[in-house]
């Protein structure tokens, strides 16, 4: 049962990550996941934000923020870039934030004017988590908690979270191919 839940979470996590990180999908393919995340953060106010896809800069993810006369437009080359643009706008223009331990999301009635011209990351991958993380509370997280963590990562521009799920199954296959017997491996879990 525990293996089934872990496998299901891993597959779902990979699907969400691919949807947020794919550069070869249609426009709605990067816009909808970003919109959904923003809607989870601010509810109906998400409908007041224009989201647009822009081309990567020299193969690197890029974003822009423009707020003028109460209209907020976020542009990005991926869902993660758009989400990071949103996070940047909240932090810089609205003095708002969401963290692991709380939030300050008192948003103004109209979006304050703000302009941040094209920002391009120098990094292809923005990594998060470590091997110890999966030994703490994550095995007991439900989908709501995982979604919160994935949203947190996207808002901060993370596009490569560590996923050690299934490493034991892979190691078992390797050991079996190397000649160990199934009964020898079962002793490991005692």
Language-model regions: role of each:
Residues 10-14:
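Hydrophobic helical h-region of N-terminal Sec-dependent signal peptides
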Residues 39-44:
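Glycine-centered helix-coil hinge/cap
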Residues 29-33, 37, 54-59, 68-188:
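Feature activates predominantly on carbohydrate-active enzymes
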Residues 18-19:
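C-terminal motif of bacterial Sec signal peptides marking the signal peptidase cleavage site
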Residues 1-9:
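Bacterial N-terminal signal peptides that target proteins for export
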Residues 50-51:
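Extracytoplasmic soluble-region selector
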């Amino acid at each position: 049962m525990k293996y089934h839940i872990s496998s299901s979470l891993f597959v779902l996590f990979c699907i969400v990550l691919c949807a947020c990180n794919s550069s070869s999908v249609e426009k709605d393919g990067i816009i909808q996941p970003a919109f959904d995340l923003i809607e989870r953060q601010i509810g109906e106010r998400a409908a007041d934000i224009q989201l647009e896809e822009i081309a990567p800069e020299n193969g690197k993810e890029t974003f822009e923020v423009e707020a003028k006369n109460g209209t907020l437009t976020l542009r990005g080359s991926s869902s993660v870039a758009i989400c990071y643009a949103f996070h940047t706008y909240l932090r810089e223009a609205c003095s708002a934030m969401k963290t692991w331990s709380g939030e300050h999301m008192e948003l103004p009635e109209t979006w304050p004017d703000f302009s941040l011209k094209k920002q391009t990351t120098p990094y292809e991958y923005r990594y998060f988590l470590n091997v110890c993380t999966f030994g703490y509370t994550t095995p007991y997280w439900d989908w709501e908690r995982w979604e919160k963590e994935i949203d947190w990562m996207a808002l901060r521009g993370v596009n490569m979270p560590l996923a050690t799920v299934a490493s034991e199954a892979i190691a078992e296959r390797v050991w079996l191919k190397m000649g160990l017997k199934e009964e020898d491996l079962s002793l490991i879990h005692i």
